[in-house]
Amino acid sequence: MADGAAEIRGRLRRVVLDEDIGGALSPMQEADRNQAIADLAADNRFALGTHPDAVTILHLSVQDGRLVFDVRDEADETLQTLVLAPGPFRSMIRDYQMLLDSYATAVAEGREARIQAIDMGRRGLHNEGAELVMARLDGKVLLDFDTARRLFTLICALHRRA
């Protein structure tokens, strides 16, 4: 829904993750999550269809097994809550976690060629995840591809293994 990122006038001021999800992040997952949040803070295009110019705060969580996008205004009042079934994301999240585990092993073993191959696979999976995020939010949220990629990373962090 975001063919022209320049046309998307809204943006996220901040992203808040539900930290009450069980299980600790691996160092690689933590680094990915922190990088995604920093990148979103620096540059993003995100607008509700009903509030196309709003600067918003996104509270991202998993509640009752569902992915919740609680989009709020700058006064922290909910503008819209979007609830998505996690099913379409499950296999990508599982693949992403396996890639991160493989990456950590390759780094520990110093296998540069393997690290590069895994990194290419990870970029491809991020792209697929971004497309899925955009498809699932189509008609509700306008966002650019880079914002969708970063949100996919955060979705994976919320669904970490216990």
From Swiss-Prot:
Q: Superkingdom of this entry's organism?
A: Bacteria
Q: Which residues form a coiled coil?
A: none
Q: Which InterPro entries match?
A: UCP032146
Q: Which Pfam families match?
A: UPF0262 (PF06793)
Give the family per the record: Belongs to the UPF0262 family.
| Name listed for the protein in its UniProt record | UPF0262 protein Acry_0160
Q: Which organism is it from?
A: Acidiphilium cryptum (strain JF-5)
